[in-house]
UniProtKB/Swiss-Prot annotation:
Protein name per the record: Ribosomal RNA large subunit methyltransferase H
Primary gene name: rlmH
Annotated organism of origin: Brucella ovis (strain ATCC 25840 / 63/290 / NCTC 10512)
Enzyme class, UniProt record, top EC level: transferase
Reactions accelerated catalytically: pseudouridine(1915) in 23S rRNA + S-adenosyl-L-methionine = N(3)-methylpseudouridine(1915) in 23S rRNA + S-adenosyl-L-homocysteine + H(+)
Gene Ontology MF terms in the entry: rRNA (pseudouridine-N3-)-methyltransferase activity
């Protein structure tokens, strides 16, 4: 299963970018034996729309296109799964998150898209299409830190699925 991260906004060079790249690199190396291929990060420009509703709709359009492209791949399971990161989502532990990623893979999903929304959040139509709306705890995180956290959690999920001692339960 190809795993892609869609993030609204750009991450500038510096220590945060180096850290996120380190975790995505670890995930890219740990994932293939488990049937998980890291397909990269797609940075979506922040919308300049006049209203929050318009901005969310414009930002969601890129994610809808990626989902539609994956669905046209022709798998009977629908092709793609979508996880949205949102402070109002469901909080999970690392083992539960790993189990969900593993189940999506085992169900034959060709692609997993993890989406980090813009400052206004996610479009309601995109939220209704999501397989999981995930909170990274009850706190609100800046987008750069949310990207670091999901990179680390994807790597951690791979190590949990592999039985690697990185995660100590």
């Amino acid at each position: 299963m190809r795993v892609s991260v869609f993030a609204v906004g750009r991450m500038k060079s510096g220590p945060k970018r180096e850290l996120v790249e380190r975790y995505f690199d670890r995930f890219a190396k740990a994932g293939p034996p488990l049937g998980l291929e890291f397909a990269g990060v797609s940075e979506i420009p922040e919308s300049r729309g006049q209203t929050a509703q318009l901005r969310k709709a414009e930002e969601a359009q890129r994610i809808h296109e990626a989902l539609d492209n994956a669905k046209s791949g022709g798998t009977s399971s629908g092709g793609a799964a979508l996880i949205l990161l949102d402070e109002r989502g469901k909080a999970l532990g690392s083992e539960a998150f790993a189990a969900i990623v593993g189940r999506m893979r085992d169900d034959g999903k060709r692609q997993l898209i993890v989406a980090i929304g813009g400052p206004d959040g996610h479009d309601p139509a995109l939220r209704s299409r999501a397989d999981l709306v995930l909170a990274l705890g009850e706190l609100t995180w800046p987008h750069q830190i949310a990207r670091i956290l999901i990179a680390e959690q994807l790597y951690r999920a791979a190590t949990i699925l592999a039985g690697h001692p990185y995660h100590r339960s």
